[in-house]
Structure formats: C-alpha cells, structure tokens
C-alpha cells in the first residue's frame, strides 16, 4: 500500500506547471563541415564563395577600360596606321586586348623588351602625345612609307610615332643631329627603330651610305647602332627587318639623336599620367559592358559582399579573395538535429535538451511553458541577439584574417625566359592551393566554434533559469523544470525576463517539496525493513544448511568430532 502511494504521488508531479528551455529547429537541408564532423545539419548557412560573375568588362572606381579593338598595344604605341583611332589622348583603368587582334607591328621586326613596355604603358592612367622632333630642317627626306603598313583608307603609310628618314635628293645623307629637353610634368616614353635592308643595293638606294651609324643618348641611355644588311624570309612582302626600341625620358632630361642613315627616328612620345590597375586583359569573347563594378576579374565583373570568389585568380579593385574552392559554407544558425552525446572541442554539452522546436520562429533560443492557463512558446531575444552578433563578427573575422593582399598577376616573359614563366606558374599554383587550404581551415574552425557556442548558449540559458527558480523547481532532466508552486502566465513571464522573485513563492514550494520528500522517506523506510527481513532470513537458511551438513557427515563417519581435555 505504501509503495502504491509513492508511485501515485510521484506520477502526480507531471501535473506541475512546467517551463522548458529549447532552441530553434527547421526543415532546412543545409549542412556544414567542421574540424571533427562532416555534413552537420544546421538551421541556416552562408555561402562564402562567390561563383557568379557578370560576363562583361565594366567601369571601375578608376574609370572605364580601354578596348584596343583590332590592335595590339604595341601597334597603338608605335602608331600602326590602321590604329589611328587611338591617336587621340586617352585614359583607362585597365586595357582590354583581343588575342586575335590582327594589327601588330606592320613592318616585320621585333620590339626590344616588349613585355616591359606593355607593363610601363598600361600602368599609367592616361597618355598625351607629345611632338619631340621636327625633321623639316634636316637634310633628309621625311615620312618614308611601306606597302607593309597600309593605312585604313588604303595606300602605303607608316607608323605615326616614328619617322622613316631617307636620303635627300639628289644623293645626300650627311650626319644630322637633334635634341629634345623634357620640360613636361612627367615621364615621356620615346620610340625609335633601326632598319636592316635585305641587300646593299637597297641600303644605298635609301641612305646613300653603305656604312651608317646612328646614336641615341639620354642621361641614362647611350646606344649606337649599325645596320645588319642581309636577306631574311619574306614577311608581309618584306625581306628587310626593323628593330624597334624605346626608352623613358624623365623630367628635365635631354634626348639626343645623331644619324647618317638607317634610323627610324622618334617623332612623337607619350607623356604618361596617373596610375591605373596596370593590367592588360587578353580575352576574346567578353564584351565591354555598360556597367559599373567594384571588382573586375579577367572572367567578368563581380558585385558581391562574400569574402571569397572562384571566378578568376586575376582581378582588380575591391574583390573577394580568390580560392580554388567551389563552396565554403559557414554555419550562421544552430545544429538542426537532436543530440544526446557530448561533442565539440570546447567542452560544451547541450545533450540534455531532447531536440529543437520547429515552432520557434522569432528567435534561436527560448522557452516553452505549460500551466493551468494553457501552453505557450517565446524566444529569448537577449541570447538570440548575442548569438547573431557573434555570427556577424565571425564573418568579419574571416574577412580580416584573409585580408592579406594576394593575387596572381600575369607575368610576361620573352622566349628566352620561358623557363622562368613555367616556374612562376607552378609557384602561383602552390600559393593558390595554400590559400584555399587556409580559407577552408578557417571556415571549419569557425563552424566548430559556432556549434560549440550554440551548445554553450543553451546550457547558459538553462543555468540562468535554474538560478532564478532556486529551490522552487525540480530539474526534470530534459531541459525542463517542474515548478513547485502555481505559476500563471504572468509568473512564467517573470521567469523568462529575469524578474522572477523566488522568495515570493518560497513557502509554497517548500511545502510541496516536503510532501515529495516525505513520500520518498516512507518509501525508503519500507525498502529498509524489507532489506533487514531478507538479510535475517538468508542468514538463518545458511545456518540450517551448515548444521545439517555436519550432522549428516557424523552419521556416515566422514566427519569426526574430537574433544581434548
């Protein structure tokens, strides 16, 4: 009878007013990886890698791009007559060169240090064409032309920035010399060339002199040239060749030239101004767009606040960092599956909560209560906001930690330096792999911390409610408290908002607890009496068995008793 009373009384505790601590769950299928787990279900994630791009070359903060159209940049610089559209002064934030552009150096030959010239020219933000020399007073014939350099309108022509000087009729080409002083407010790129005829006949026809000497000097340049006469393979109808050169004339410096033949003389130079991104994008298909962007990649424009992108490793402006990863997902919500086992690197355990609540939509953590007035659910805004703030800080933290300037720049090398180019590409690839590994490791660590902090947040909220209730409630062991006094909705609200006064309900709770303890005491006494009776009965049975064994042994002689006096 006593045992029945105990069970009935304990069962009645289910009728107590109850408040439970829980967390949000939903039907999200998002998963994240952590340092120690793969594909962990979470309520919400944020993709950190931008994969979308607008396939266009857009204006940037430094201005519009310059599209070279049918021309290579060296053709623009030296003034290929089919590139006259670029003769006007122009500016750019970056340059777009089409790999299939047909117009390069029209008269066959090579440009010395072409890659460096491309870099120096493209690094400026604009140029202004400056006339350096007027050859009208020289005893030469000016403005030589070639059928290799036809103009857009048809007919023979020649480069617009350099002048092909030949002998003066009837048959004169003496030494001529000139000088130019750079009084502009910046550096000037100047250009010249040397003509190498295919035979002596053409040499004397053009320059009279079989042996010529040309010199170009500045404060830092002192070069002399003689023609290398001889036939070459026919290119663009020419067996002759031209070597093309360039230099930089700094402010206040003097450029001097002297020649008696074979000099393709400097006529116009380029006054470079400002700084651009210094990039020449080579792409065949992406058009110039009527658009603006903060981030321009070689593959298109990106407008994204994400910290990473995998569109292109070459980019300009305020861009996400490039990583060779298709996806890096950051947990910005809670673990979305119930768990009853310890987990995490930081010791937080929320396994005492049986599972999340799908009905909680206005917060991450909160309360569910039941009393005589019904049931209710409410979010705890304070703990939710603190968790959201931490998530925001995590995103900023990732951006800050990855905010070291890193990008792969196209390195252009001459034929002789192809091995250097190959080594450079391998180094770039290794750096990219390391960068991607660092980014992934950082995200894994932040995900681990987020989920562990979630466990800790639930535990902290549980402990805070436990402190508020003090001895006025019983821990039900599953994230819930059975309250040992009547607690209406107003009372429940005070527990949730932290204004609950446990002393106000202390007497009622003590009385209820004493009833529970009394029932437990009676139950314990009953069990103790039963234990004593059982022990005594077992001892008597054992004694009877031992005595019976002795008597049986003495009767059959197997056991003797000897008494010694």
Curated annotation (Swiss-Prot):
Query: Which compartments is it annotated to reside in?
Result: Virion membrane; Host apical cell membrane
| SUPFAM superfamilies on file | Influenza hemagglutinin (stalk), Viral protein domain
Q: Which residues lie on this side of the membrane: Cytoplasmic?
A: 550-565
Q: Which residues cross the membrane?
A: 529-549
Glycosylated positions are 26-27, 139, 150, 222, 303, 310, 497, 524
GO cellular component terms, A-Z: host cell plasma membrane; membrane; viral envelope; virion membrane
Question: Which InterPro entries does the record associate with it?
Answer: Capsid_hemagglutn, Hemagglutn_HA1_a/b_dom_sf, Hemagglutn_influenz_A, Hemagglutn_influenz_A/B
The entry's function note states: Binds to sialic acid-containing receptors on the cell surface, bringing about the attachment of the virus particle to the cell. This attachment induces virion internalization of about two third of the virus particles through clathrin-dependent endocytosis and about one third through a clathrin- and caveolin-independent pathway. Plays a major role in the determination of host range restriction and virulence. Class I viral fusion protein. Binds to sialic acid-containing receptors on the cell surface, bringing about the attachment of the virus particle to the cell. This attachment induces virion internalization either through clathrin-dependent endocytosis or through clathrin- and caveolin-independent pathway. Plays a major role in the determination of host range restriction and virulence. Class I viral fusion protein. Responsible for penetration of the virus into the cell cytoplasm by mediating the fusion of the membrane of the endocytosed virus particle with the endosomal membrane.
Q: How does it assemble?
A: Homotrimer of disulfide-linked HA1-HA2.
Quote the protein name from its UniProt record.
Hemagglutinin
Q: Which organism is it from?
A: Influenza A virus (strain A/Turkey/Ontario/6118/1968 H8N4)
Q: What is the lineage of its organism?
A: Viruses, Riboviria, Orthornavirae, Negarnaviricota, Polyploviricotina
Q: Which gene encodes it?
A: HA
């Amino acid at each position: 009878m006593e045992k029945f009373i105990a069970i009935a009384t304990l069962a009645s505790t289910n009728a107590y007013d109850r408040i439970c601590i829980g967390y949000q769950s939903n039907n999200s299928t998002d998963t994240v990886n952590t340092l120690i787990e793969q594909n962990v279900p979470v309520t919400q994630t944020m993709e950190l890698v931008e994969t979308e791009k607008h396939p266009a070359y857009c204006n940037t903060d430094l201005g519009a791009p310059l599209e070279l159209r049918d021309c290579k940049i060296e053709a623009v610089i030296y003034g290929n007559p089919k590139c006259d559209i670029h003769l006007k002064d122009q500016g750019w934030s970056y340059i777009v060169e089409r790999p299939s552009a047909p117009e390069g150096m029209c008269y066959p030959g090579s440009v010395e240090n072409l890659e460096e010239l491309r870099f120096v020219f493209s690094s400026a933000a604009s140029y202004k064409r400056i006339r350096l020399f007027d050859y009208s007073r020289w005893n030469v014939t000016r403005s030589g032309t070639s059928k290799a350099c036809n103009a857009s309108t048809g007919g023979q022509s020649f480069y617009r920035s350099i002048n092909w000087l030949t002998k003066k009729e009837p048959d004169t080409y003496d030494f001529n010399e000139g000088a130019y002083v750079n009084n502009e407010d910046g550096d000037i790129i100047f250009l010249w060339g040397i003509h190498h005829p295919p035979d002596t006949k053409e040499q004397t026809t053009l320059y009279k002199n079989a042996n010529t000497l040309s010199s170009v000097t500045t404060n830092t340049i002192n070069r002399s040239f003689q023609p290398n006469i001889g036939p070459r393979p026919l290119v663009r109808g020419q067996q002759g060749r031209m070597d093309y050169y360039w230099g930089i004339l700094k402010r206040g410096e003097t450029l001097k030239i002297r020649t008696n033949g074979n000099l393709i003389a400097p006529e116009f130079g380029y006054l470079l101004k400002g700084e651009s991104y210094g990039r020449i994008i080579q792409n065949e298909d992406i058009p110039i767009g009527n658009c603006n962007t903060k981030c321009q990649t070689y593959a298109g424009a990106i407008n994204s606040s994400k910290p990473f992108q995998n569109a292109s490793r070459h980019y300009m402006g305020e861009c996400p960092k490039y990583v060779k990863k298709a996806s890096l997902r950051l947990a910005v919500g809670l673990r979305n599956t119930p768990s009853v086992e310890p987990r995490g690197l930081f010791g937080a355990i929320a396994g005492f909560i049986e599972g999340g609540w799908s009905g909680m939509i206005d917060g991450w953590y909160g309360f569910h209560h039941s009393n005589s007035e019904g049931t209710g659910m409410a979010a705890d805004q304070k703990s939710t906001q603190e968790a959201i703030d931490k998530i925001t800080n995590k995103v900023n933290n990732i951006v800050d930690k990855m905010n070291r300037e890193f990008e792969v720049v196209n390195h252009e090398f001459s034929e002789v330096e192809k091995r250097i180019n190959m080594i450079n590409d391998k180094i770039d690839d290794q750096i990219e792999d390391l960068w991607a590994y660092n980014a992934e490791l950082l995200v894994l660590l932040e995900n681990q911390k987020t989920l562990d902090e979630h466990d800790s947040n639930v535990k902290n909220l549980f402990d805070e409610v436990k402190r508020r209730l003090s001895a006025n409630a019983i821990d039900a062991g599953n994230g819930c408290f059975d309250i040992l006094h009547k607690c209406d909705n107003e009372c429940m609200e005070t527990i949730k908002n932290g204004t609950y006064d446990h002393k106000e309900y202390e007497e009622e709770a003590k009385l209820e607890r004493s009833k529970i303890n009394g029932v437990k005491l009676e139950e314990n006494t009953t069990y103790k009496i039963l234990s004593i009776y059982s022990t005594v009965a077992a001892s008597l049975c054992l004694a009877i068995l031992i005595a019976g064994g002795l008597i049986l042994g003495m009767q059959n002689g197997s056991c003797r008793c000897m008494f010694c006096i």
